[in-house]
């Protein structure tokens, strides 16, 4: 039985109103996999899997201690960025294994593993098409909750933002999250997706979010219509 589209869902929209916004999004934006961060207890093992078993990819970024000499850092992590695909592919996706380094406080990576297990900490989707500001405005109308403002990184020419937790976790501050980003330059001259300042700043931002322990999900799951069934959904968006 089809869902009653006059009822309201996340964002306070009727499902009919939601259809109109979703059609607009599909016409104006494309989302592609940019990278994914994977929390692990052993970065050597996981990196070996990607480099020596699955892809033979290239490491484009290494950080044995993201915090480095930062005197204000209370914890840290190790990470590498592995490019998937050929050397000359500007739009290649990346896998980024991360291993926590505890300090004054537990590393956010180990905090995540404690609550969720070893798995994806966030998946980054890259926007192509119109501006990320317009995408955020439209998705917020649909009920998407973002836990960061729109962040700009001038070293990577990157705009990015993070959603609330992807699942009904008992501890949403632990994640996992979705990152939405827009790379303003994927030219032949600038293909570097990972800069140390970007990674360091992002780690600090997520650590502060976890310390606040705000219970934020990506959408209010309780407001999803009870009669919505993925196997009954017949929504199509004609061009």
Indicate where each model-derived feature is located.
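Compact beta-rich and alpha/beta scaffold cores in large eukaryotic transport/transcription complexes
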Residues: 65-67
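Glyoxalase I/VOC metalloenzyme domain signal
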Residues: 1-61, 71-239
């Amino acid at each position: 039985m089809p869902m009653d589209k006059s009822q309201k869902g996340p964002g306070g929209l009727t499902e009919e109103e939601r259809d109109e916004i979703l059609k607009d999004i599909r016409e104006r934006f494309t989302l592609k996999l940019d990278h994914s961060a994977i929390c692990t207890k052993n970065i050597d093992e996981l990196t070996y899997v990607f480099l020596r078993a699955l892809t033979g990819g290239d490491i484009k970024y290494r950080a044995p201690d993201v915090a480095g000499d930062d005197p204000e850092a209370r914890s840290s992590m190790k990470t590498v960025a592995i490019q998937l695909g050929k050397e000359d592919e500007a739009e290649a996706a990346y896998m980024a294994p991360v291993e926590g380094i505890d300090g004054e406080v537990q590393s956010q990576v180990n905090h995540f593993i404690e609550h969720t297990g070893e798995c994806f900490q966030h998946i980054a989707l890259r926007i192509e098409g119109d501006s990320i500001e317009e995408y955020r405005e439209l998705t917020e109308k649909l009920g998407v909750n973002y836990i960061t403002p729109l962040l700009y990184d001038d070293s990577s020419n990157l705009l990015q933002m993070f959603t609330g937790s992807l699942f009904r976790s008992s501890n949403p501050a632990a994640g996992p999250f979705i990152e939405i980003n827009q790379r303003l330059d994927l030219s032949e001259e600038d293909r570097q997706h990972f800069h140390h300042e970007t990674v360091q700043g992002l780690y600090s931002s997520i650590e502060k979010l976890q310390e606040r322990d705000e219970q934020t999900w990506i959408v209010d799951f309780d407001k999803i219509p009870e009669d919505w069934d993925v196997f009954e959904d017949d929504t199509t968006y004609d061009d």
